[in-house]
Regions:
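Short acidic, glycine/proline-enriched helix-loop-strand junctions
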Residues: 117-147
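Conserved AdoMet/S-adenosylmethionine-binding subsite of the radical SAM
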Residues: 1-109, 114-121
Length: 147
């Protein structure tokens, strides 16, 4: 059997030993990371108390299998706070991290369906293409843009 096991995770529980051990059995990990900025992380992910972005990033880096990073790009407001992980600064920081961890792929996608946060924008196809062109110039990792 040549089947490969891939696990999809939002990456928030990788710091727990049992979870990390189970996920480590996979050949590939689709690991969610929308930002490298702690303030944006709080707005986008609304994490449980005590869960910190640097911990998530540490454990993404430690994942022993092939890493595929998934990033949801969004812009607008959430709970009255401005959010935009499509800025050059945000994308450059993500590109640097994705390169550093030697991911085999970086999947970037927009909001696909209505969200409880009505002030979040869905990126147009043209905006997604622009994001793809920009990040490809700043990483050696293959980038897949989903529409």
């Amino acid at each position: 059997p040549n089947a490969k096991l891939t696990v999809l995770t939002n990456s928030t529980q990788l710091h727990k030993r049992k979870i990390a051990d189970a996920v480590a059995l996979a050949d590939k990990g689709l690991l969610k990371l929308d930002t490298t900025d702690p303030n944006q992380f709080l707005i986008i992910n609304k994490p449980a108390k005590g869960l910190e972005l640097n911990t998530i990033m540490q454990y993404i880096e430690l994942f022993p299998g092939e890493k595929i990073i998934q990033t949801l790009v969004l812009r607008g407001e959430s709970d009255g706070k401005k959010i935009d992980n499509t800025t050059e600064e945000s994308l450059l920081a993500l590109a640097a991290f994705v390169s550093k961890i030697e991911a085999i792929e970086w999947m970037i996608y927009p909001i696909d369906r209505p969200t409880p946060e009505k002030q979040l924008e869905k990126m147009s196809r043209e905006e997604m293409d622009h994001i793809g062109e920009f990040v490809r110039k700043h990483t050696n990792v293959p980038v897949t843009i989903r529409y």
